[in-house]
């Protein structure tokens, strides 16, 4: 198994408010689960590189609106969580200085793809854009939250949110009631 870093979001239920964001190595995930309170739920994104742990005991973070860049170095990346107006978590990606600048300037979400090593505007090819309503940051300024108006779907699998399944005991998946707005074309 290749070692990769994954993003962990603790989410307060039932409000689905973000309580924390941290990055760990994938092989540390089973040990991380052992530190969580009994009765947590686990939702996983389509690429299996971001995990939401949901529990009533997680305390939500305080967020403030921001119009400033979090990064000023060309090589730095900051986690960015996209949510809709109701607070539903749509996806998690990364931003660099250029993507943040374009997001602020255009009002549409731009990200930096680590796998392609390039800047991208969400929806540039699909038309499934994210119009930014506001940009939030926790008081420690460790990541950004783009509250967006999502066109069609955030997930390349056709789901409104990338978090459309819950991991059950072991490796069993349960589909969540997340609308699937299109079927992706097979290549």
From Swiss-Prot:
Question: Under which pathway is this protein filed?
Answer: Amino-acid biosynthesis; L-histidine biosynthesis; L-histidine from 5-phospho-alpha-D-ribose 1-diphosphate: step 3/9
InterPro entries, from UniProt? PRib_AMP_CycHydrolase_dom, PRib_AMP_CycHydrolase_sf
Q: Name one GO molecular function term.
A: phosphoribosyl-AMP cyclohydrolase activity
GO cellular component terms attached to this protein's record? cytoplasm
Q: Name one GO biological process term.
A: L-histidine biosynthetic process
Q: Which reaction does it catalyse?
A: 1-(5-phospho-beta-D-ribosyl)-5'-AMP + H2O = 1-(5-phospho-beta-D-ribosyl)-5-[(5-phospho-beta-D-ribosylamino)methylideneamino]imidazole-4-carboxamide
Where is this protein found?
Cytoplasm
Organism's domain of life? Answer: Bacteria
Which keywords accompany this UniProt record? Amino-acid biosynthesis, Cytoplasm, Histidine biosynthesis, Hydrolase
EC number, UniProt record: 3.5.4.19
The cross-references to PANTHER family, in alphabetical order and at most eight, read: HISTIDINE BIOSYNTHESIS BIFUNCTIONAL PROTEIN (PTHR42945), HISTIDINE BIOSYNTHESIS BIFUNCTIONAL PROTEIN HIS7 (PTHR42945:SF1)
User: What is the protein's quaternary organization?
Assistant: Homodimer.
Question: Which purpose does this protein serve, as stated in its record?
Answer: Catalyzes the hydrolysis of the adenine ring of phosphoribosyl-AMP.
Per the record, the similarity remark reads: Belongs to the PRA-CH family.
- Know the name of this protein? Phosphoribosyl-AMP cyclohydrolase
